[in-house]
Amino acid sequence: MEAKKLQKFSEYSMGTYLLCPKKYRYIYIEKLFKKQKRKVNEYFIFGNIIHLTCKEFYQKRAEDRSIENLYNIFRESWKRSGIRAFFKSREEEKELGEKGLYMLSNFYNSFGQKVPYLTEHYMENIFKDYIFFGRVDRIDLSADGTLQIVDYKTNKYYDVGEDNEERARKTMQLKFYAYLLNSLKSNVTSASYYYFAEDKFDTVEFNQESANYL
């Protein structure tokens, strides 16, 4: 007897399903349309550079985790990334490069020497006939043993208010990650987007009730 193939949901495909179940069916089940690929441009590569820089920073020894070394990792990642091919002038490259250094100075001031419990952590679990999976940028461990999820954002922060449908959509990714991690016998008490440019945390407190939107 052939084993039943379980349907897989990432936070992105889950978002598609919640926004429009028909669209989800056409793309992921009937495969009538190709999944939309992200457009590769300087901003997409820039976001990857920032994420990679933060990850590599914590692979350094504690005594080497200075802001100067953080900047150096960024510059080396920039050179290797191929991002220069997307700029029309050196001035454009300089402007975005300086923005990156500013973002990383915010990051250093907010996180500094605080070593994350996990970075780029992949997780998946089975829920009845479904598999949920995702990858978290950062997980911090509190003294009481609880976990805080942090998802890095290089885009601009925008306020959508509280207790409305748009807020629920915006924070669905955080709730998805927290719900999935808690299902793996962890205790997540909060999940945050960290916006580099504004040095701002957008946080939701997590409990089982918070997962009802899923």
Predicted regions and their residues:
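An N-terminal structural lobe/cap that precedes and organizes the functional/catalytic core
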Residues: 4-5, 33
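A non-catalytic, helix-rich entry segment at domain boundaries
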Residues: 53-120
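An acidic intrinsically disordered interaction segment
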Residues: 8-23, 133-145
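A residue-level signal for conserved active-site and pocket-lining positions in enzyme catalytic cores
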Residues: 20, 50-51, 100, 138, ...
